[in-house]
Structures are given as C-alpha cells and as structure tokens.
Amino acid sequence: MLVKSLQTCKICGAENTRGNHFGVQCCRACAVFFRRRAGTKYLRLKCLSVHCGEAARFCKPCRLKRCYEAGMKIEYFQHNRDSIKSSSIAQIPRSFANIVGRPSLVIFCVPQDSYQKTFVDLNSLVGKASEIFTAGPESPYIGLTQLKKLATFSNCSKEWAQTRFKTISHGEMSYFWEFYFLRTAKWLTYFDEFQRIPDEIKIKLLLSFWHVFARLDKLITTAKARKLKLCSQQTWAMSNGLILDFDRTKVDFSDISNYPTEDLFYFLNSITALDLQPQVLELMELEVSDMEFNFMLAQLTFSYAGKRFQGDILKICDRFQEVLSNDLHEYYVKEMRTPRYSGRLGKIMKINNAIQNDIWKNRPRGELAAIFNVFKVEFSHPEMFIDTGFVRN
C-alpha cells in the first residue's frame, strides 16, 4: 500500500496541509491569517507575548513575520473573483423629472414657452411631393400586377455605396426627412389605385405615413447590409447608401433642443427604431424578395393611416391592401410555385405588427416631449411628425 507523506505547514508546523498558498506550503489557517493581516500595523509591531513560539503558538506580529520569511507575497492575492458583486455603484434612478430638470411636485404643471422656437417651413417640400404626384412614375412600367409595378421602383436588390456620417446635426436630420418623404412619394406613383384618389387625400396620406415607410426601409436595408457584412451589429443602413453608427457618430441636436443628446433619444426612440433589433435579425433570416418587401411597405403604411384617420380613408386603405394582397397571392402561387405560403406570410406580418406596436408604445413619449417643450422647433405641417416624438399627437 502506498502511503502518502504528510507535509507540515512552514509557518505553524501543523500537519496535513492543504496545498500552496501565496507561494508557500502552509495550512489554511495561516493562509487566511496572511490574507487578512498582510500590510497591516502588525508589520511594525514587536512580539506581544512572552509565550510566543510555545506549542506552535505565535502572536500576530511574529506569525506575520514568519509568513514573510517563508516567502509569502501579497502579489499572489486575487481580486474580483466573486460571482456576485458584494457592492454596486449607486446611481440616481432615471426619471422624467431628472431629464426635464423639474421636481416631481410640479411635474404636472404645463410650462410656458421658455425660449424662442425655430420655425421649420415645409411648404417647399410638400410642393415637391405634389409635383411628383402630378408627373407620375419616373419610368412607366406595364406590369401584370400593381405589386409588380411597386417593386420596379424598389432598389432593395441593388448594390449601394457606403457613406458613413461622422457627425449628425439638425442639417443632416432634415436631409433624412427630405429623402424619405420624397422617396415615399415617388414609390406611391407606381401604385395605380393610389393615383386615382383626390390630390388632397394623397398629400394627407403621404404626410401621415412617410416616417413609417422610413422605419421599414431602414430595417430591410440594414438586414441586407448586415447579411453582406457591409456593416456591424451596431450600425444602421439607409437605402441611399448612408450608414449610421450611433456608437461612433457624433450627434449634435443643440439647435433643436436644450437637453442633452442622450436624453433626446428617449423621445426619438420611435423614429430611430433602436428597439427593433430583433426584427432586423428576423429579416436577415427571411431574406424577403422585392415583391414581399413592397407588400410589407404597403401593408404597414396603409394599415397605419387607416387606423389613424378612420372613416373614408380607412375604407380607401383597406381597398389598397386588398388589391395588393391578391397580387401577393398570385405571386406566391404562380411565380414562386408556393401555394402553402401561410407560414412565411405569418412571419412577415409579425414583423409589421412589431413595428406598429413599437409606434404605439412610444407615442406617450412624444406627448411628454410636446407638453414640456423638449424640442424648440415648430413645423408648418405638424401632422407630418405625429408619432415621431417631435410634436404632440
């Protein structure tokens, strides 16, 4: 039988030690003692007991001295190994009172305008949209279905150059507004049913859902760009080739608000679509075609407008959706040879519903921003920015 030799502690002489501690073969008691007393006042003290050393008993100064003489080193101490932190850094809870700088006792008082607001005249932009509706589609296309005509305008499958913004201010933001507003108008000219309605309803619908169009367009383009590894998980891509990295891009909104930029994103969360990262992953997995993409755009925008206005506009939007739904059915059955497409269509509708739910969820934030004058801008057409965070609904 093999007998394992017992090792003694080099500090106190105890038998059957439990291994090497801080560079020395010792017992656990001496290891714990050194961990607690190393670097303390006992280094400077002299022996405290006349019986020190008897029966392997040492006073604290002598025991600590023997630890150092045996070769124990504080450099072997290990820190921050606890799975649960023993203490946490206290932070001031985030609240609306902290953001607007008003105490909760008076938070429900509607303040007066404390500064001059910047007026944004959108008449020229709306005029351009009217001209686009009058001129009709840029490249007339005789398609079998209206959904195919819409798909001819979409450049979802085309390559696009990458341009990264280093700084975003109110100037760049107004460029985004103009791009998506006019892009939505041009897209609508390819829909024959839309071209048949009165001009005033065309403008009313465009003013209401251009930003909804922009949300889905950004999600689709971002999914495609990430699939091609053209941008990272922290960046967002637009269909005009621009890439936004909120971790690296400097955002300056000082011209439209007196509040810190990091607080403004709370109110602009709906239009930035930062909550829709899971939907981007779903779109990457689905790899929607141009036909499906345009159906998603139409269903999302017309459904949003119908719920917002009700009445006759709801009937018009329902008719639009019915026409395009029939076209999508024909696309699946005749072109894709997929008569059982309910599963894929269900995933597509789930994404659209998530976008609409995100809009409804963030709507109260826009109400708060308007009540407490978070943004110092005033628009000639405020209905254009409902559900964006800039104006009150």
Swiss-Prot record:
GO terms for molecular function: DNA-binding transcription factor activity; sequence-specific DNA binding; zinc ion binding. The keyword rRNA processing does not apply. It is found in: Nucleus. Pfam families: Hormone_recep (PF00104), zf-C4 (PF00105). Residues 121-388 form the NR LBD domain. Keywords: DNA-binding, Metal-binding, Nucleus, Receptor, Transcription, Transcription regulation, Zinc, Zinc-finger. It comes from the Eukaryota. PROSITE patterns: NR_LBD (PS51843), NUCLEAR_REC_DBD_1 (PS00031), NUCLEAR_REC_DBD_2 (PS51030). The keyword Cytoplasm does not apply. InterPro entries: C.elegans_Orphan_NR, NHR-like_dom_sf, Nucl_hrmn_rcpt_lig-bd, Znf_hrmn_rcpt, Znf_NHR/GATA. One of its GO terms (cellular component) is nucleus. Residues 6-79 bind DNA. Its main location: nucleus. A zinc finger (NR C4-type) spans 9-30, 47-62. Belongs to the nuclear hormone receptor family. Orphan nuclear receptor. This is Nuclear hormone receptor family member nhr-90. It comes from Caenorhabditis elegans. The gene is nhr-90.
